[in-house]
């Protein structure tokens, strides 16, 4: 019987996982797709820069395709997303065209939130922005309200909370915004809006969030001042951006699935190559180390301003731990797979201060508790986190991704270490960030 089989079921795809009775080990080397956060930003900055931007290693998943689709509709020339090298002919800052159609961000919150910062400052242009059913229920007020403080004219459904959105571009004014949450999307949206203002736009956060926008904006020529002590970033407007060559490293959020899988499956050893290890993203490595994982960075290097390494991971005996606070923004997307690690660890793991997971592609706290619970995991759900009693064997079950890519992949890893058959409904969600995930899983499971 095949370890993995993917079949169409009604209007969705169903993944069946049949681990052998003796268990399965993962061996070999692999590369994960390009970093999703960096891919979005490279496309956007290329579109608003002057001249040509060449992007190598771009994630060819559904979310960056949504970004490319939106910016093509506003006049940017972006080559087809089907090769290792993508070429963007930029319009120049403030020169995006008014589109003749609705801008559809698909499932991508990053596309919608960051793009709003650019649209708000496109004078004399009207934009309508929407997304899929999931995105139309994710909160947009967190970027709309500070943009309105800058003078933006934005209308949103449900009293300013949700897409669809209408944006009337206007001249924005700089502000100093104290964000109530540490969010790279909020910060990036406002920095992009600040590019066209006359003066300094500053964003101060309660904790450090990922800094890909700051690194890339500086590479494209924007003038920024960064204060790591107060978690503040200032962009000095108006800016002039020039097209660049961008090499996108592998996505640590995608690598996390392999790091956990090889840790919990006895006899496993994987080398995950070319992974971005930006310190604003490495919370997952710190928590796994705290749990006793055997992960070694090799061949550390800098690639177009981003730290990169190959990560060697060997099977180990994990122990439960507690994490929360300032580390959460540095591993927010990895919590679903860390919950799987916790289910296979000895002892109790407690995840705190993670209420942001309730407004991701799904309510990820509820999804983890529900779907891992169906497999026999002992998960207690709190308003802002989870408690997981590890060490009890999981059993195969019929579960659902809830159309969330990270839930789909986390459940597949849990299924490999479970007894009996697992069926994952709506498994096609994985293609949002990792189109080759199931194929790669089949390869490394064969050794």
UniProtKB/Swiss-Prot annotation:
Which CDD domains does its entry note?
EPSP_synthase (cd01556)
Classification via InterPro entries: Enolpyruvate_Tfrase_dom, Enolpyruvate_Tfrase_sf, EPSP_synthase, EPSP_synthase_CS, RNA3'P_cycl/enolpyr_Trfase_a/b
Q: Name one GO cellular component term.
A: cytoplasm
Coiled coil located at which positions?
none
Report the subcellular localization.
Cytoplasm
Which residue ranges run through the membrane? none
Pathways per UniProt: Metabolic intermediate biosynthesis; chorismate biosynthesis; chorismate from D-erythrose 4-phosphate and phosphoenolpyruvate: step 6/7
- GO molecular function terms noted in the UniProt entry: 3-phosphoshikimate 1-carboxyvinyltransferase activity
What reactions does this protein catalyze? Answer: 3-phosphoshikimate + phosphoenolpyruvate = 5-O-(1-carboxyvinyl)-3-phosphoshikimate + phosphate
Q: Which residues form the active site?
A: 333 (proton acceptor)
> Which enzyme type, at the first EC level?
transferase
Q: Which GO terms describe its biological process?
A: amino acid biosynthetic process; aromatic amino acid family biosynthetic process; chorismate biosynthetic process
Enzyme Commission designation:
2.5.1.19
Q: What are the protein's UniProt keywords? A: Amino-acid biosynthesis, Aromatic amino acid biosynthesis, Cytoplasm, Transferase
Binding of phosphoenolpyruvate: at which residues?
A: 36, 109, 138, 185, 364, 406
Family from the record: Belongs to the EPSP synthase family.
Describe its assembly: Monomer.
Role noted for this protein: Catalyzes the transfer of the enolpyruvyl moiety of phosphoenolpyruvate (PEP) to the 5-hydroxyl of shikimate-3-phosphate (S3P) to produce enolpyruvyl shikimate-3-phosphate and inorganic phosphate.
Q: What is this protein called?
A: 3-phosphoshikimate 1-carboxyvinyltransferase
**Its gene?**
aroA
